[in-house]
Amino acid sequence: MERGQSSNQRNNNNEFILPDNFSELSLKTIENIQRRCRKGLEPGTVRYMRDNRCPGYGWLLPGWLAEERVVASGRVYKHYYDPSGRLYRTQFEVLYAWEKAGLILLDS
């Protein structure tokens, strides 16, 4: 084993699978996420990014992203990111952050 590597080596590939119609604001958020990301991924993990143009994510504000992280076992983890790249683990956390900022989400 080389120096600086752990026995449980992680995949340092932090690339995302993106839809074709991602907005410029969403791409900027991706850059911020990559800048903040320090840990690699478990081998076999795939990351799909969604923005407010994707089905089921129309509730997100422009620049906010949802990540669907599929691990080797097939389990899907959802995470959310604000435009600065900050991670939110649940939709409730996102809505709470918006409420603290004075924003209100109205269901249509």
What are these regions (language model features)?
Residues 1-39:
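Intrinsically disordered, low-complexity regulatory regions of plant transcription factors
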Residues 2, 29-108:
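Signature of WW domains and closely related Tyr/Trp-rich beta-sheet microdomains
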